[in-house]
Regions:
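Cysteine-centered motifs
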Residues: 2-5, 17, 22
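Basic polycationic patches enriched in arginine
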Residues: 6-9, 29
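The AdoMet/dcAdoMet-binding core of the Class I SAM-like
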Residues: 24, 33-34, 38-41, 48, ...
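SAM/dcSAM-binding transferase cores
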Residues: 28-78, 93-99, 265-314
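A short, flexible beta-alpha/helix-coil linker loop
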Residues: 90-94, 202-205, 230
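Alpha-helical subdomain
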Residues: 207, 211, 234-240, 250, ...
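C-terminal substrate-binding/active-site "lid" region of AdoMet-derived donor-dependent transferases
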Residues: 214-277
Length: 314
């Protein structure tokens, strides 16, 4: 760490220090994006902000853009304990504990893992939206030998993957730059269709337009394996969430469960299997076993999911 300006050097980057700012300079790898690390103007003096900006940018102008909400790129804030990905200051898109990078910090990410109550050994998980990689990392560590494909449309989000300890691509794990809606259609043509499709596809304006139609949800249904599950994080205005819930219910013939979270997110599980009929006592036992293995409070999600089934939330 540079003691003069409190900026941490990043792996693969040399740092040219001045009395005002540290400017990261790519080292011999042109494909490595320039990540500018500055003292954060928002919180405490030990916080930093990471920006995808060139070394010769006007840093004061950039920070004013961030503060005003006009900045149109993702950025990362680090307080020494937690690292968060933002599309704006008003909303945390992803959060990572620096002590435990593979833990799920946000309630909605924990709730999205409730698909394991119904499908414990998926072979292939397709995730739409990388963010800080929280879901992908957790699945990589805790969901058996499942192959994980992550599709992210914004290369600027992918550029931060190392900041969030997202695993390198290997035989089980890969991150692809592309439109999630297009990849859902492609996956429907694969021999090994995904057992789980996780949808967390947001930009700074909310749910991506390409995943906001009945046709998209029909393509998800068609792409899933026979007993497959779609898990969707719906956030934003109540009317928008209700519209998505209605589309999902129509396509999946009301085989839908939901978890309403206090932060305004709705986590929706939709089941392709026409014979879907949950056995809640068995699911409760599964939840206890999963809690022991992963540390997540699956039993509380069983209660909420069963309640949504009884009340026919949609």
């Amino acid at each position: 760490t540079c003691m003069a300006c409190r900026v941490r050097r990043l792996p693969g980057l040399a740092v040219q220090c001045t009395p005002v700012v540290c400017l990261p300079i790519p080292v011999s790898r042109s494909e490595v994006p320039s990540i500018l690390v500055l003292p954060s103007p928002f919180f405490t003096e030990t916080d930093t902000i990471r920006l995808l900006e060139p070394e010769d940018c006007d840093t004061q102008w950039v920070l004013r853009q961030v503060l005003s909400g006009a900045y149109d790129k993702p950025f990362v804030i680090d307080d020494g304990t937690t690292r968060t990905l933002h599309f704006s200051l008003s909303l945390i898109q992803s959060s990572m504990s620096l002590k435990d990078p593979f833990a799920l910090e946000l309630d909605y990410t924990q709730a999205m893992m409730s698909f394991q109550l119904f499908l414990q050994r998926p072979q292939h998980i397709l995730t739409l939206g990388l963010g800080g990689g929280s879901l992908a990392k957790f699945c990589y560590r805790h969901v058996g030998s499942a192959r994980i494909t992550v599709v992210e449309i914004d290369p600027r989000v992918i550029a931060f993957r190392d900041e969030f300890d997202v695993p390198r691509d290997d035989a089980r794990f890969r991150v692809i730059e592309g439109d999630g809606a297009d990849w859902v259609i492609k996956s429907g043509e694969w021999d090994d269709k995904p057992d789980v499709i996780m949808m967390d596809a947001f930009d700074r304006h909310g749910l991506s337009g390409s995943v906001s139609s009945t046709a998209f949800y029909q393509s998800v249904y068609d792409a899933l394996a026979g007993r497959g599950v779609m898990v969707a994080n719906l956030a934003g205005e109540k009317d928008d969430r209700a519209e998505h819930l209605a589309m999902i219910s129509e396509v999946f013939d009301e085989r839908v469960l939901s978890i309403m979270l206090s932060d305004g997110n709705d986590i929706v599980l939709a089941f392709r299997n026409p014979s879907f009929n949950p056995r809640w006592r068995e699911i409760g036992n599964t939840a206890k076993a999963l809690r022991t293995r992963t540390g997540l409070d699956y039993p509380k999600y069983v209660q909420r999911l069963e309640r949504s089934r009884r009340l026919r939330y949609l």
